[in-house]
UniProtKB/Swiss-Prot annotation:
It is an enzyme of class 2 (transferase). Its EC number is 2.7.1.86. GO terms for biological process: NAD metabolic process; NADP biosynthetic process. HAMAP family: NAD_kinase. This is NADH kinase pos5, mitochondrial. GO terms for molecular function: ATP binding; NAD+ kinase activity; NADH kinase activity.
Length: 386
């Protein structure tokens, strides 16, 4: 017999006499009436209530409607309005790892959704579902199940959490994504977590606006991959730890452009223009512009500058037989392995599988104010202590 909180005694069979009047405060205990005695039983559903998404209804696909904008020339907006044919039910929530504050916010969010929207089913990663087993969460074993069941995505964390969400749908269309920050700076985080109740209510009731962020399709053939993979930010090919610079041939629409001798090359989306490409000297591109950005990483020739191509173009990169190193290929920061000499990688834009990101309002100038704030433009520089 084990003594528990509030005066309970728990037996080996998880049943004991109720000795405290406030027994209803304990989670996971059901009341059993046996004559004049009240017993409680610990419900195993609270300890092992992890279910699989393949038991849920199929995905609800929203409609994205064109909307007008008095701020734009011609009155046409680059944003779209989200319209659900019926309220979303299967919500995937992804959170930042190894952070107690994020854990608390995650629990608060899940409990609010379950209490306010009882028809909603919360899906999360397996280790998170085990850690918060008392919340009755769903998880998955096959990515294909996730692609077929998830109606919408919520992220709690930073830009990296959004990239992780995009990687889970790297071979399929992506549901709309609602992102919350916890005070950290990020180019992809429109909402502070303190506003999650209002933001989700607007999202749930089709009052949200969406910015469609284009993705890249990276077609390649390696020992591990022989298919196309989507990228939200960029793909880059880099010499890695080798002391030798990579020699890379670049083709545009199958026409030879240049043979670059550099640490590597970056092909990024407008969304990715504020990531690795920006650190390598690339320009900042508005996310509503559909374009491919080619940025060299520490090129041997100073004449090789970043180039912006239309999204209708195809960029191909091939490791030259002059290269003394097998460069490493990475997509959105995830290494995929070494490339072979003569291997070609084709990069194109993806229009039909863009990432629908929920934004704060229908005003398109939010991006301008966000850039000014995040990059601290127009802020004077001061020494600490002055």
């Amino acid at each position: 017999m084990i003594r528990a909180a509030n005066g309970f005694r728990i037996s080996v069979r998880n049943t004991a006499v109720c000795l405290a009047p406030n027994f209803r405060q304990l989670k996971g205990f059901s009341i059993i009436n046996l004559g004049s005695l009240q017993y409680f039983r610990y419900n195993s559903v609270y300890s092992k209530s992890i279910r699989l998404v393949n038991t849920l209804e199929n995905r609800i696909v929203p409609v994205y409607k064109e909307c007008a904008s008095p701020q734009s020339i011609g009155g046409k907006s680059n944003l779209k309005q989200l319209q659900w044919p019926k309220p979303p039910k299967n919500i995937l929530i992804l959170k930042k790892r190894m952070d107690e504050r994020v854990d608390h916010c995650f629990e608060t969010l899940v409990q609010h959704l379950q209490q306010t929207y009882p028809d909603i089913c919360i899906i999360t990663e397996t280790d998170v579902a085990k850690k918060f087993s008392y919340l009755n969460l769903y998880t998955w074993t096959e990515i294909s199940d996730l692609e077929q069941k998830v109606d919408a995505i919520i992220t709690v964390g930073g830009d990296g959490t959004i990239l992780h969400a995009a990687s889970l749908f790297a071979r399929s269309g992506m549901p709309p994504i609602l992102s919350f920050s916890l005070g950290t700076l990020g180019f992809l985080l429109p909402f502070d977590f303190g506003s999650f109740q209002t933001a989700f209510a607007d999202f749930y009731n089709s009052r949200s606006f969406v910015l469609m962020r284009m993705r890249l399709r990276v077609a390649m053939k390696t020992k591990l991959y022989n298919e196309s993979i989507y990228a939200m930010n960029e793909m880059h090919i880099h010499r890695g730890l080798s002391p030798h610079m990579a020699v890379l041939k670049v083709f545009v629409n199958d026409k030879f452009l240049t043979e670059a001798v550099a640490d590597g090359l970056i092909i990024s989306t407008p969304t990715g223009s504020t990531a690795y490409s920006l650190s390598s000297g690339g320009p900042i591109v508005h996310p509503s512009i559909n374009a491919l950005l080619l940025t060299p990483i520490c090129p041997n020739s100073l004449s090789f500058r970043p180039v912006l191509f239309p999204d209708t173009f195809k960029i191909s990169i091939e490791t030259s037989n002059k290269s003394r190193v097998r460069p490493q290929l990475s997509i959105d920061g995830r290494p995929l392995g070494l490339t072979d000499i003569g291997q070609r990688i084709d990069i194109t834009s993806v229009k039909d599988n863009a990432i629908p990101c929920i934004i704060r309002s229908h005003k398109e100038d939010d991006w301008v104010s966000d850039i000014v704030s995040l990059l601290r433009w127009n802020h004077p520089f001061h020494r600490k202590g002055w």
